[in-house]
Amino acid sequence: MDSSQHHPWVGNWKLESETGFVDWLIAQGATTAEATAERDIIRRHTTLTIAVDDDRVDLIWSTNIRGRLRRTKTVLSYSLDGVSVTTTDTPLGSVSATAAVEQDMLVHRVIGPRGTETHRRHIVGGRLHQTMTTDDPALSTTTCELIWRRTR
């Protein structure tokens, strides 16, 4: 079976709208200016590709700002068993993450210096809804939602 039929969130996505993302980034330690700039770059210049191969999922973030020398591509690859840990270095420090398919959702659990984050992605009305919740003991629980539209 084609993985895009089996997992409806497989494909290329552009950010369409968000609720609480800037506040979520600020809670992660970004300044208001940094958080706003990051949201704008993601909205205008970034494509998220989700690919599944066997029992692995790849999240590929491609950013291309025309007229500037800013092209980045970040690939995060996870086992979909919900147990195997992938460790990644971030500006906030080292984080460990797992991935799993729960019902119709792609779920990542990320443990880092600021506590645990849960990222859930699922399809609603043809759009990819991504909900991110941070449970930081020093902060109240923070949640945001990103809505992505399919490209190509």
Label every PLM stretch briefly:
Residues 1-152:
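Hydrophobic small-molecule pocket/channel-lining residues, especially in calycin-type beta-barrels
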